[in-house]
Regions:
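N-terminal interaction/assembly modules
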Residues: 1-115, 119-133
Length: 133
């Protein structure tokens, strides 16, 4: 399975876990690709930080009003953008690649406004991180 497909599987697992109010292991069995499970697990581990960033940069939209699938996409994108070191493998995706993957996932599975919304938030986080460096 390609990394893009593994990212999308992690997004869907997080989305289903939220909707069904079940542990991650139920929508995503442990025998899936290691990257997929690790990505979803790390998103949950870092969720308070990721959600704080989403709240900060989505000034006109409270976190609770953002569609659950879009929240999952944002969380995965933010994790890969900010914490690539927590994921398995030596081929971390560059920041711009993480944003592109999130936007492409939104184009495929969300409404018309979602890709630009996701791009705006992830781009703002990246610009803020660059200016802090």
């Amino acid at each position: 399975m390609r990394r893009t497909e593994q990212r999308r599987a992690a997004v869907w697992a997080l989305y289903q876990s939220h909707l069904l109010d079940r542990p991650l292991g139920e929508p995503l069995p442990r025998d899936v690709h290691g990257f997929t499970f690790a990505l979803a697990e790390q998103v949950l581990e870092h969720q308070p930080e990721l959600d704080d960033l989403i709240r900060h940069y989505s000034t006109d939209w409270p976190l609770e009003r953002i569609a659950p699938l879009e929240r999952s996409i944002l969380r995965v994108g933010l994790l890969e953008l900010l914490h690539p070191e927590v994921l398995p493998g030596d081929d971390a995706i560059p920041p711009e690649g993480a944003i592109n993957e999130a936007v492409e996932t939104a184009k495929r599975f969300c409404g018309a406004g979602a890709p630009s919304f996701i791009n705006g938030i992830l781009g703002a986080v990246l610009r803020a991180r660059i200016s802090e460096a």
